[in-house]
Structure formats: C-alpha cells, structure tokens
Regions:
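Q-loop/switch helix immediately C-terminal to the Walker
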Residues: 6-7, 13-27
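A short, proline-enriched helix->beta-strand linker immediately N-terminal to the Walker B motif
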Residues: 67-71
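Short catalytic/signature loops enriched in Gly
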Residues: 134-183
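A short, surface-exposed alpha-helical micro-motif characterized by mixed small hydrophobic
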Residues: 114-116
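H-loop/switch region of ABC-family ATPase nucleotide-binding domains
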Residues: 108-109
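Conserved ABC ATPase signature
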Residues: 48-52, 56
Length: 183
C-alpha cells in the first residue's frame, strides 16, 4: 500500500526529492521514467522540496507512490496546485495502474477530473457515505439515482452551477429511501 498525502509538507525538507522518490524499493531508472511521464524535467531529482512549485511537489508525491509498486494506492487530494494537463496525466497514471489489476482510492473534491478516471464514485455528505454510483452515470443526470449526487452533478460549471441550500440538501437526504442525514 502507498499513500499520496494531501500536504506537500510530507516531503522531507532536508533530502533531495529524487532520493525520497527512490526510497527503499525504487531505482533511479524507474524514478526518471516516472518523472518524465509527470513532466518533471531533468534536474528536479537533485532539488530540495523548497525549490519546487506546489504543482511540482504534488507530482513528486504521486511519483513516490507510483514507484513503490504498491497494489493499492490511497491518493488524498493529489492534484490541487497542478496545471490541468499535469493533473490529467497523474490521474491517468492511476487509471493505468487500475487497468493492470491494481487499485487506487482517489479522494478528491474535483468531481470533473474523478469521473473520467474512476470506475465508481462514492459521495459523502457531512462525513457520511450517502451514495456509490458508477462513474459513467455522470454522463447523464437521469442515471444518477440519489438526489444529492444529482445536485453535485448540477453544481458543476458545465451544468450552470446550480446552488442548493443546506436545507435543500438535507431534504434530498431525507427523501431518498435508506438515507437519513441523522445516522
């Protein structure tokens, strides 16, 4: 198991990032290949974390998990601070890993990115799991069975940013059979 932590402060400020990525299980050839796929230019491996931009540091954290050959990766908000092309590439690498029979749990607020690489999407509200649906169901709101999940879909920029009040959200949760905001 490997973790892509949410905070870039998990990088050791006293150690060059290449050495951190290689760690105990990797090698320089693998590290260079993963860095190249994540658009981390030559020379980044010889830098300290404080010399990196936020997006570069996040890509280094993703590299650390990918080079570990873990069968399961937990990626906690891995893409904030990355340029869109870099975020898409990082998530595609997780998708490729899943296609090879490994698993990744992506924790994110970026529903737009997640639905393009995920098999399933788990929706939480107020710390509670309220829905699990196939990612492909986000192609059409009528495929989404839970009202709150539909509300999230409608709140996406391409769906006119439909805003729901807290009372409306709680009403959604109360009206769906088997879901109750109080449990």
């Amino acid at each position: 198991m490997a973790l892509v932590p949410q905070s870039i402060t998990y990088l050791d400020p006293t150690m060059k990032v290449g050495k951190q990525v290689v760690g105990l299980n990797g090698n320089m050839i693998e590290q260079e290949a993963v860095f190249a796929k994540l658009a981390l230019r030559e020379g980044v491996s010889r830098m300290y974390p404080f010399e990196l931009s936020g997006g570069m540091a996040r890509r280094v954290l993703v590299s650390t998990a990918l080079i570990s050959h873990a069968q399961f990766i937990v990626a906690d908000e891995p893409t904030p601070g990355m340029e869109m092309k870099d975020a898409v590439q990082a998530l595609q690498m997780f998708r490729d890993m899943a296609n090879e029979g490994k698993s990744c749990m992506l924790i994110t607020h970026d529903l737009d990115l997640a639905i393009h690489v995920a098999d399933r999407v788990a929706v939480f509200y107020d710390g509670r799991l309220i829905d699990v649906t196939e990612a492909r169901n986000f192609q059409s709101p009528e495929l989404l069975t839970h009202p709150y999940t539909r509300a999230l879909f409608n709140a996406l920029p391409q769906n006119e940013f439909r805003h729901y009040s807290k009372a409306e959200v709680e009403q959604f949760l109360m009206t769906k059979e088997g879901y109750d905001v109080r449990y």
